[in-house]
């Protein structure tokens, strides 16, 4: 076989295998037997083994090709992967629809796409010129983990895109028809595990003495985050695509078109997605799903209702972290009956005493539940919940177990009423209860060991300072040995502390201390979250960081100054001011500074909000000198601006590079839209001047670009299709 013929045969085999993968994973309609498929793979592997120079990264044989890694790199999402607002009943869905109609106008025609809400792990996949170049987890919605090597092992995720609208005529086993592949496309979807596959996996893990997973979602998440891709490859993971983050060269107008495009490109798309013109029909389909829940081959925790039109999605926008154009209609929580063995209290980081139920183990939705929330003392008293009662246990949102109430008819007289203890179980301090509040608190803020432990656990958590390698056991060790009395003491730990501690070898200690040191430069809002101030979560912390810019400025602010900020109410303001008024808080900030922790906002972070780009829409055309279009888009959005894929009256500025697209350039001239180049964009961001100071009027731009012939704008610039769902 000569080289040309060999090359053609190898490529033909790859195309056939990709096509049959599409038939199997996307259409669920294979046209060849497993034996025939295996024969194709064997031939391809044999040819590549004999001629390694023909091996390419996108070959079907190369799904497992990366060595085990120590950790996953962080990935910044260009388009945020947002969460979803939830509805627990049809009334809440209709209320959402009423808000949509008010925002769009009563005469707007609205269609809906209803999709199953798969209970898995949200991921994003980036393809350049049809080749998978990066895959990442959702993470916190803005930053995820690079798990490309592991995602490549999932058979349903194409390594190379194709257009599979039809099989070539007369070619039962032939290659698919090819069409235009987007130069850039970011695909969003869900990695999951079928219930039957999950049960088989647990049997295998148990037989080999390994820890079994609690449910399919945990199994999928754990499998995807294996350090060794070879382990992930052995796990029965699957993938459904449901959205696009950004795209070049292809325009879609609706969510329904998006799903069809994804299917055509070779991605598995859930066949149960439906489009409806009327909300009543969409809700009827949701009810049908609820009745079929236990018949499905995979776990779902609800359905997602989306506005079909992408233009209407853009008009509706986002509130907080939730898109206004979609809602998750959650299924009723699963429930079971168990016996209440005891009620114990936990001490939170702010001193709140929370009662928790210890129950006889019971399986709810695939999870063995031994503890459940009782909320507060009033909740227990109002429902007359007693130790020894048979109680109804639910998992709210299929996640958090809680006690609904007792089954009074099953009482036999042995049940005992419960009362909140008078003193803190951790330090013995008398508990207090403020007027008008339901919570009891331990006021021993600076000394109570339970509060110290909880504050440190909160400080190192992913939503705060995100210090890898420190969990509940490590914090308990630090506190019990007297090494750490507050969060600032973490930065005083040295190798000597661990010299005689079993399980802490040199490498583990080095990694631990490196992670602690690396957290010193976290964004200011993460540090504010980490302090554990009552009522202060990520959103409030971001508002405070953006406005004050440093812990010193925030600490010096009065409650009235804080209350004046949009999004901050009097209760939050009072809590923040009270926290920083405490002597121990002032001492803690001083210790953090001495330890080298950044207590001021980074300039680039502060510039990302409220600067000259805020509220402005940019379009990028041509090749920029020092950055890709994706990087330029990220830069603009990081500094408060928006990026669009086409020029319109709503466009504020056109960023021009070499060989600009003729369509965009001409449209900008027609509309008189100001134009800036990369240097102007960077100067704008760096100087804080308005973009108009950097812009060249469209009428003056012709001479500067006359030597560059306008090109057809076919590939287009990245078109960001709003926000993704999880």
From Swiss-Prot:
Annotated segments matching region Disordered: 690-726
Annotated ranges, domain BRCT: 608-698
Coiled coil, from the record: none
Gene Ontology biological-process entries: DNA repair; DNA replication
Superkingdom in the source lineage: Bacteria
NCBIfam families registered for this protein in UniProt: dnlj, PRK07956.1
Chain's role: DNA ligase that catalyzes the formation of phosphodiester linkages between 5'-phosphoryl and 3'-hydroxyl groups in double-stranded DNA using NAD as a coenzyme and as the energy source for the reaction. It is essential for DNA replication and repair of damaged DNA.
Name of the protein: DNA ligase
Organism annotation: Roseiflexus sp. (strain RS-1)
Gene name of the encoded protein: ligA
